[in-house]
């Protein structure tokens, strides 16, 4: 990987939780390619995790942000403008839902959790994109993360699947809005990875095994796989790509049924 690919570029990473996060894989790939990074966090508990990781990548810009609060989002970008005069890329790796409502039936989703899930997991990308646009006068790239549960029904995903479907639609509309200004907007649909967010999904080990046995590549992806694909979408290598949902899932999304050589899996 060329360490000059992202030289001179500055990017904001939102949603880093720990060194198992997909956001960490993306941040590492961008940093290794020469990018200068800033990070946001929500709450003191996450600051204790994010700050040391930011320092590993040579960043001292770690700023608070509650994406559910419009004033907090504005304050984040005001603080970022005090440090940088421009922003070249944005990574939105944020989603949340009450894990108790991811089990059982989608039809039993409460109104409160539905609204909260859509606000944090979907609208937040639009909110931060609106602020980031102002720091991209010469164009840039925005990226969010989604999952195959937006396209097909997946176990224990429920309202998050609905939210990710809305997020994918948002990517297309944002791409249209911002394209005339040279700003590209894309998504990565990553296969299942053991992350903090995944811990709220029931039978996740079963999902991992199923994906491994039935994907064309016969393996699960990892954060480095996603990081390298994100680097492509965030760099000038993808200068003609916008409104795209790139699947990084070992090809699982093309499969129509269980592979003939896949062993049976018992739920644990």
Please place each PLM-identified region on the residue numbering.
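Short C-terminal tail/terminal secondary-structure segment
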Residues: 231, 242-268
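Short, small/polar-rich loop/turn modules that mediate ligand/substrate recognition or access, typified
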Residues: 179, 184, 241-243
